[in-house]
A protein has these predicted regions:
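Surface-exposed intrinsically disordered loops and tails
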Residues: 236, 314-334
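Active-site-proximal region of nucleotide-activated glycan assembly enzymes
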Residues: 287
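Extended amphipathic coiled-coil alpha-helical segments
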Residues: 45, 284, 309-313
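Long, intrinsically disordered, low-complexity segments
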Residues: 108-110, 123, 273, 330-397
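Active/binding-pocket-proximal capping segment
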Residues: 299-314
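Substrate-binding/catalytic groove segments of enzymes
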Residues: 94-96, 132, 310-318, 351-354
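Short loop/turn elements at secondary-structure junctions
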Residues: 166-168, 298, 303, 359-361, ...
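Structured, solvent-exposed acidic/aromatic patches
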Residues: 1-281, 292-299, 336-338, 396
Length: 397
């Protein structure tokens, strides 16, 4: 909340000063304004995903004559998308290149920035809904139109090599591979791939009685299908079997599997590329948009197979029925999988650790959050107290 509004405030101040003539960057004025609008839109959009309401701040707001009003998250997202669209107009009307340290590691062109904004509009539209009905009601044709103009390669930043907490650093990537300490992969993510009865037995127990177990996964990202000399499972391409959990906490959170995909982030001390928007996410968004708009099963299957077959080692989804948004994640063709169930499983598997909050928002929109889970967060208490407003919260049973 505070970091995002700090970014919005800085971007807004920059636009105000350029428009007022207090600052002139010559031929680079449009580059600065376009980038500032991008920052405004990205930041407001994240606030709309996370919180139930927020402020909208841009260069048109006169703080000297009044105060900002909290407005519902949908209105915040509307403003965010308008800001991203305004950035796109500037990017497409001009031909410039950003300095490589504005988005660390690459000097992005104005055309590439327009693609980035289009992809974020598609991402934000899909993730905003708080339930299944709202997710189905998304204008998926607009999502598709933005995907058609969106990213054509993975997007992210280059880590600065300065370790944890540095400027160009992602805590999501850094901590997702900390399996040797506290980071474990939840069975609700990987369990659907279990070909033994371990996961179904685990689910059948009361949460207080659940404990960690060894799966027999058919997913090559989790296990390569062979055993080491000491009988442990040899690693998959993205995960591995690890030792027993030593934490003192509820055993339903224990797991014998760790996520190893981004280990180079920590082993290099943050000196590697950090991908924040994978091309596979564009494919998953396109697949879901086709599901909602009557697209062909073969086109959907082709998109899902890019990770399901190539990374997971599963058979093609070409013969599967469409299913519905009510289908639980399931990658197994031999166990009643549908295109919908594979989409849910694949998207959560492939994008694990890529962008903070992604799986939380997906489960919310698909109606799969655990009972009692809050659907969004309240405005932070510090701001409520400053404005003299009542504290409140969400969630619980």
């Amino acid at each position: 909340w505070f970091g995002l509004y700090g970014a919005i405030s800085a971007a807004t101040d920059g636009i105000r000063n350029i428009e007022a003539g207090n600052v002139s960057l010559g031929d680079d004025n449009e580059r600065a304004v376009g980038f500032a609008k991008l920052v405004q839109g990205l930041s407001h959009g994240y606030i709309a995903l996370m919180f139930d309401k927020g402020f909208v701040l841009d260069e048109s707001v006169d703080l000297a004559s009044g105060t900002l009003e909290l407005i519902p998250y949908k209105d915040v997202m509307d403003a965010a998308i308008k800001q991203l669209e305004a950035a796109i107009v500037i990017f497409k009307a001009n031909n410039f290149t950003l300095p490589a340290d504005w988005i660390n590691g690459k000097a992005y062109t104005s055309a590439e920035l327009a693609q980035l904004a289009h992809s974020f509009i598609a991402r934000y539209m899909a993730l905003l809904p708080r339930d299944k009905a709202a997710r189905a009601a998304v204008n998926w044709s607009v999502v598709l139109a933005n995907l058609d103009k969106g990213l054509t390669e993975d997007w992210g930043v280059m880590g600065d090599g300065a370790g944890r907490g540095s400027i160009w650093y992602s805590g999501t990537h850094w901590y997702s591979s900390q399996w040797n300490v506290w980071q474990r992969v939840d069975y609700k993510l990987i369990g659907p791939s279990d070909e033994s009865t371990g996961y179904s037995d685990w689910l059948a127990k009361a949460p207080a009685d659940r404990d960690e177990f060894i799966m027999e996964s058919g997913d090559k990202r989790i296990w390569d299908g062979t055993l080491s000399a000491n009988g442990t499972q040899n690693p998959g391409t993205q995960m591995l079997q690890i030792g027993q959990t030593t934490f003192i906490r509820a055993s339903y959170g224990f797991s014998r599997y760790g996520h190893d995909r981004f280990k180079e982030v920590t082993t290099s001390n943050n000196a590697v590329p950090i991908v924040l928007f994978r091309m596979s996410e564009n494919n998953f968004l396109r697949a879901e948009a086709l599901m909602h708009t009557g697209g062909s099963n073969s086109a959907i299957a082709g998109l899902l197979d890019k990770t399901h077959v190539n990374d997971g080692g599963y058979p093609s989804t070409a013969s599967l029925a469409l299913g519905s948004i009510n289908d639980a994640p399931n990658p197994r063709n031999d166990d009643g999988a549908t295109l919908w169930s594979v989409l849910k499983y694949e998207k959560n598997m492939d994008l694990l650790g890529t962008w903070s909050g992604l799986q939380y928002w997906e489960k919310r929109g698909w109606g799969e959050s655990t009972t009692g889970t809050l659907i969004h967060f309240p405005v932070p208490a510090a701001d409520l107290e400053t404005m003299g407003l009542q504290l409140y919260t969400f969630g619980g049973v």
